[in-house]
């Protein structure tokens, strides 16, 4: 009788532990559309290739003219101010590199507009071929499908 009670209690404890572990874990991200996810990841790569190389003419083609860039420290910037900010970084801080943390990126479609991309990235200093002094920050990009291709219309950059 005592042995049966111990087995039952152990079974209940084991079952409740497995139940808690199974149902308390968040589900891993799975893109709604793999094609959309891959497209936005490619555009993100091209955007920051331009930023990291200081190619401002290329970089500004990734933004809509009505861009709103919200930065938790810098405040709100429009298209012209954003391009000026990137130009200043390219001129005065050309050693700055953006490094995307790919596993942090999620892309969700917004009906009749385009996707929202969220993720985490680092900005680092390139010194003698090594990335040092990296800061890790979060971002939200709202992409819009335009006649000229995918462009970012809204940016939220935070966690600085």
Describe every region a protein language model picked out:
Residues 1-10:
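Bacterial N-terminal signal peptides that target proteins for export
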Residues 8, 21-65:
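Short, low-complexity N-terminal intrinsically disordered segments enriched in polar/charged residues
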Residues 13-23:
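Hydrophobic h-region of N-terminal signal peptides that target proteins for export
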Residues 34-39, 55-113, 120-122, 131-134:
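A solvent-exposed, acidic/Ser-Thr-rich amphipathic alpha-helical stretch
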Residues 107-115, 143-149:
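A short, structured loop/turn motif at beta-sheet edges
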Residues 123-127, 143:
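Beta-strand elements of well-folded, non-transmembrane domains
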Residues 136-160:
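Short beta-strand edge/turn micro-motifs at domain boundaries
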